[in-house]
Amino acid sequence: MSDSPRLTRRPEWTELEDHRAGPLLHPALRELFAADPERAERYVVRAGDLRLDYSKHLITDETLALLQELATATDVFGLRDAMFRGEKINVTENRAVLHTALRAPRDAVIEVDGENVVPAVHAVLDRMADFADRVRSGEWTGHTGSRIRTVVNIGIGGSDLGPAMAYEALRAFTDRSLTVRFVSNVDGADLHEAVRDLDPAETLFVIASKTFTTIETITNATSARSWLLAGLDGDEKAVAKHFVALSTNAGKVSDFGIDTANMFEFWDWVGGRYSFDSAIGLSLMIAIGPERFRELLDGFRIVDEHFRTAPAEANAPLLLGLLGVWYGSFFGAQSHAVLPYSHYLSKFTAYLQQLDMESNGKSVDRDGHPVEWQTGPVVWGTPGTNGQHAYYQLLHQGTKVIPADLIGFINPVDGLSDELAAQHDLLMANLFAQGQALAFGKTGDEVRAEGVPEEQVPHRTFRGNHPTTTILAAELTPSVLGQLIALYEHKVFVQGAIWNIDSFDQWGVELGKVLAKRVEPALTEGADVPGLDPSTAALVAAYRTHRKK
């Protein structure tokens, strides 16, 4: 149990409250830029290939100094170092938190309970690479001798969101002769649509479940097995050539019919939402190849080292985490928008939703006390420019404080025609324009100068002062994707450390799963389920009455 003062009673916290109520009671970005001609150059930080411009935030040098004092007081750096050392900072499950070990170099030494875990990590990576090369080259064939043309990844949560996001992000680097599809929802329509046009003889299923008991995943895997056997004359031997497992439960894997030689393990010190650079990334490795996958890992490691070694004033994940605390706790912001100006990052924000909201969606601190401060925000967003024609109206003229990240790349991906590549300038013009419009808005006088009728002026005025971070990189590559993900991983860590919550458990996921197991017999068999509230009992009854048999 900690004997340190509660967060909101720390002097560093109250100083920030006073700062917000005093000099930053009514912050104006136009005034902040006018007062500091070098602001645009000074408020930039670099991490690897990423350039972060945070000049359009409602902060001053004093704000940054006070936030850094809060980080020091809450021992963000001590907890960071403990994580990298392999200490068990996941206090509710008594586990180490070592997703960083998944991208450590071969010669690194990272111990858990006295054992260096790095050799095991690289042993699995080497096995993954061998298997991926065999599938990609056609050496690995299906039961009938046909080459594998489609990989179907079946998982849920971290076993789906990460690989699916990265596959879309790196589609330009994939082997176009082989495609990957992802199935996660226990809704049978998900699997149906994924396999309806596939040839079982050319399909490989990757089943991702650490325990091999995850109900949604095993339900889908069992249905996929039935689909496969129906298409291959019911020969049970076919399963071993068309299914591989990402799991640690050899018994369950073997019972399913999968050869345990094709089971790829991972460890309990890797949380699901941090796991796609482990064996969970096998489908991605098959798609982009082992060399590109290792470039992805290198990108992760670049920002890991940046977070571990960069000074506070130049530490990008620390800065993003502090800004999130600033807006959530001192401006009342309830959400955070992540707006990538890249079609390839169409699933990036959905991935960050789990990373951030499952990590920091907590209401008790590490000592089990209810928190008295805001914790994790709602994370949302879609790629630009689509969002501009949907919800940017609220960002520009709504009443809520919504910090946003604008993510863009200076160069388009290779492989586009000259005409399509030229559209990239228009895409990025929109990114830069939105950052300016959100920050500086448009005054009434500026509107009047355009000859707008006076009665229209209030409707066409934009107050600005909407904070954004602009993140730029030269182009979207496997390494840059790894850097982006690690940037957000460590940002989430910083916020959890300041809020004194356990960012690495997810007990909130469990309750609904337990109740679903109890409710299902009432739907399928009409069994009585004790403990149902009247509303849920009535819903179950209505379902049974109208369910088609």
From Swiss-Prot:
Keywords from the UniProt entry: Cytoplasm, Gluconeogenesis, Glycolysis, Isomerase
Record-linked Gene3D superfamilies: 1.10.1390.10, Glucose-6-phosphate isomerase like protein, domain 1
Record-linked InterPro entries: G6P_Isomerase (IPR001672), G6P_Isomerase_C (IPR023096), Phosphoglucose_isomerase_CS (IPR018189), SIS_dom_sf (IPR046348), SIS_PGI_1 (IPR035476), SIS_PGI_2 (IPR035482)
Cell compartment(s), UniProt: Cytoplasm
Pathway as given in its UniProt record: Carbohydrate biosynthesis; gluconeogenesis; Carbohydrate degradation; glycolysis; D-glyceraldehyde 3-phosphate and glycerone phosphate from D-glucose: step 2/4
Active site per UniProt: 358, 389, 513
EC number: 5.3.1.9
GO molecular function, one term: monosaccharide binding
SUPFAM superfamilies registered for this protein in UniProt: SIS domain
Reaction catalysis annotation: alpha-D-glucose 6-phosphate = beta-D-fructose 6-phosphate
A Pfam short name: PGI
Function statement: Catalyzes the reversible isomerization of glucose-6-phosphate to fructose-6-phosphate.
Membership in a protein family: Belongs to the GPI family.
Alphabetical list of HAMAP family matching this protein: G6P_isomerase
Name this protein carries in UniProt: Glucose-6-phosphate isomerase 1
Upper taxonomic lineage: Bacteria, Bacillati, Actinomycetota, Actinomycetes, Kitasatosporales
Gene: pgi1
